[in-house]
Amino acid sequence: MKKKLLSALLSVAMVSALLVGCGDTATEPAADAAATTDAAADTAATDEAAPADDAAAATGSWDVTDGGKVLNIYCWNEEFKSRLTDHYPGYTEVDGTHGTIGDVQVVWNITPSDDNAYQNNLDETLLAQADAAADDKIDLFLVEADYALKYVDTEYTVPVSALGLTDADVADQYQYTKDVVTDANGQLKGVSWQGCPGVLVYNRAAATEVLGADDHDTVQAAVKDWDTFLATAATMSDAGYKMTATTNDAFRVFSNNVTTKWVENGAINIDANIKAWVDMSKTMVDAGQTGTADLWSDDWSKGFYPEGKVFCYFGPAWLVDFCMAADDTASIAAQGGWGATEGPQGFYWGGTWICGANGTDNAAEVCDIMKQLTTNTDIMKEIVVADNDFVNNKPAMDAMAADETYGDAVLGGMNPLPMYCAGVEKIDLSNLTNYDQGCNESFQLAMKEYFEGNATYEEALDLFYTGVTEKYPELTY
């Protein structure tokens, strides 16, 4: 069983730092470790099906009890810790890595995602979970959408129902957030306090200078579809602005609107919308309308400042409020200089899910954390007001979207929640696969060679195929 679980945990290894992240306040980039990839390939080649395909996974052998004295939480940054510290009733902070809930000690194990360190640490600890001392067992851990199924489709995560959470408890959560962490047997294996629908975030000063006004309707008319977006990029370029900081800014918008999967019947598939991103990006790079820097690089974030001369970014609430340097008085965000509009297409980006670990002896505490931080409407509203997060609770978001007193300082006091609420209902995960993270990252990495003129499209495509099949040797193309 351990070997089969190892295969499941290692089969979705990563290759680069293109995932969401911004220091200590939002999800951080994750990258592949070569040794992990090699281990996955070796194990997958010699082992039978992962537990998700086993009868045992369907029925579940859930080792969840109460009475534990230490609650171990594994995560990759401070975001969830701050939510628990600030909003969970009865939590007392002791120091940076310890707290208490009643007579239960809370221990935070925070490992940054850089170079896949978080997942590597989590995998190693989960593999030893059955033999670990009670006070050392993982009780609760976090996952992101791009690799959630890696953990959800194993017996290391327990259904939330086994912890005590009911269908009625999660009835007001957005469906896509439940789809992300539903296993192959239809069991809900996690919950999230946030939703991550995205918008186009634009530089108000640039809009006023180039488009004549910075209001929502004026800007939306200039970016209403990709043809119009491209035409506006030329106008912005003539005025000295890049339309986006990098080609990768728009990638999530295109990849979230595909009509086919990355892998179809075991073969790698390039969706027409992914190819459309390539074509638009190449046009913009050649025209000097965007750059080729990696997300989270210094060149990418230069546009957070007026002298960076970037018109727009694409992102959800966490990008706007936690990643655009709002704490730096010289930034556009600190001056309330950004606006928001729907852009050419709706999309989502990121999100963090809370999973209960099989073997926890703090089931009641794990369940109550899930219940309070993801289903309590009053606490959800508190999070919106205090943290400008988009929360995973329909009544809370509908109320806040209609609240004329609410505004986001980064967006000049604008209330973007009606846009987020409209966008979240359109999120479609029907084309999600276990291979998405690796394919998304490898494709962007390979196409950078094409955009920069170091390879033809066909040569870059070969680089992509080589990289993906090294990670997933079972795939063809």
Report residues per predicted region:
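Periplasmic solute-binding protein
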Residues: 145-161, 175-218, 230, 246-266, ...
